[in-house]
Structures are given as structure tokens and as C-alpha cells.
């Protein structure tokens, strides 16, 4: 690039990392396949449980993530008849301007940007979480990292800032996991319904093969995609907004079911309000509604968030088990939320 200084450092191709951390023929592969099938059944209504994707806003400390996973596994077992619990394991953070972009981009929180190490740490952590018997869900922010990690994800999301991107719609069309598209940051549902329709079709596009070579990828389409309501200029989780969104889905000839994100604009960026969102969703479910098939929740061992700037702050001084990105519910409130949702599902299904 003329007049611009750039530097490109090659890293190992995806197949090298997959060979080093294999899952073929293991219980991890079985769990992921089974969970994907269960999520598809929840999507099509043949499983009447609620999908709950819950976990830290982002992963910055693998040890804390594993501690959280062990506690969440107990909740997964406890509510297995009413909830399909999947741990939120986000390694990449979209940024409106600048900031820490996640564990893959800067795994050591020191602006060394060891992306090769970030991919290795992420793959190891995903395997460790799945080995517990706890499936993982994540956001797909770029089109290369899924080649390194996609086989370990049971459910995926395309964020509000990328739902309208053709590249991400093409990516979703080739992923094996069910994928949720968030409404736009302004609350626009149409871009999400358009994305679902686009991802359902086959595409040809440039990407990277698992051997590291640039390739033309042909996909058959992913028909297991859905809308995630995350709020916009105002929250959109209440029964009236859910019904309006389902009308738009029906008008687009799509299934009239969706997921609600309890965080982000729906909680007005106030983590405690996630409980209020969950109560509203629980009331809708308890009244007999099947329109909301799942929820997303930002949760960690400890409530809130702590400020951290890579290159300026000391990572060793961070409080254990607390987010360094969006504020999260603490563990006690997280278990209350799960119990609330479980009771609502049980009440609906008993009726």
C-alpha cells in the first residue's frame, strides 16, 4: 500500500491447530453434534425447552472462564428438562471506535497482539469447556477464525454491527451451527430478516481453506438461522415488540419465533436490568407464548465490570472473575434468572 506502512506476520494454517487440538471421534464432537441438533429442534418447535446462552461478555481470563463453566454445568444439569443451557464464550469484541478487541486479538492484554497465541488459547479453552459436558456459543466477527474454531461451537451469533454485511451472511451460509442475527443498532429488524434469507441460500466467495490457501468456497446455505432482539434506540423485548417482530418474520415467510438478548440496548447497558428483561420474557412464556425460544444473558462470577486499558493498566491487578468489557450479572443473580426462566417454561408446558 503506497504511503502506508504495513507488516504481515504469517501464522500456522487452521489444520495445524486442529491437528494439535483434535476432537474427531471424541465425546466433545458428540456433545457439539447433539447440542446443535437440540437447538435445531428448539428452533422448529419440536423441543419445548428454552435455549439460554449465558456467560461473560468476553473472555479475558481462561482460568476464570473455566471456574464459571464448572458452576454453569451444575445449572445445566439442574434445569435440563426446561432449559438448554449453552455457555457464552466470546473471544472477539466489535468496537465502535477503538479498544481491546478480545482474547484472540490480544490474549496477554499487553498490546503484543499475539493472534497466533490467541487462537491456540481459544481452541484449548473451548475444548476444555466442552470436555466438561458444557456446550459453547460464540459470535463470529471475522471470516477466518471460524476455520480455527468453528467445529467447537454449538450455536453462533452475528452481531448488530455485522448483520448487514454480505461477507458475514455468506459466512453464516456455510456454518454448521445454528446462527442468530441481531437486529441493527437502531432497532431495525429488516436487516436481520434479510440476513436470514440470504444465509439460507448457497453462495460462492473467497475465503481461506483449512490448509491456509486462499480458496473459492461454495456453501449450500444454512436454514437454521434466526433473529435476536437486542434493542435499538429503545428496548424491544416486551410482548408488544416481540409480537411486532414476529409479524415481520411471518411477512418475510420465516418462522415467527425469535431470541431475546437481555443485555445491550434491552437493558439500557445496565447489567442489573437483565433480570427485568428476563422477567418480562418469563411472563410471556408462562402465559403460553412460544414466540421467544431463547435468551442471551451476560453473566460472570462477579457483578459489574472493571476498567482496563491494555498497555496502560496492569493485567495482574485485575479482579478475578469480573468483566473488562460490558458489565455482567453476578453469579447469584444469574442463578435467580435461570430459576425464573425454568419455572416459566415448566408452567407453560404444564398448561
What does each of the following model-derived ranges do?
Residues 2-9:
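Short, small-residue-biased leader/transition segments that mark boundaries at the very start
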Residues 14-23, 219-231, 318-319:
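Gly-rich Lys/Arg/Thr-decorated short loops/hinges at beta-loop-alpha junctions or inter-strand turns
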Residues 37-52:
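N-terminal glycine-rich anion-binding loops that anchor highly charged ligand groups
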Residues 51-64, 326:
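Conserved phosphate/anionic-ligand binding catalytic regions in large, soluble enzymes, centered on
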Residues 55, 260, 330:
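Conserved, mostly hydrophobic/aromatic
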Residues 62-74, 97-104:
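Glycine-rich loop at the start of a catalytic domain that most often binds anionic cofactors/ligands
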Residues 82-237, 241-242, 264-265, 269, ...:
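Active-site-facing alpha/beta catalytic cores
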Residues 301-347:
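Internal helix-turn-beta structural module
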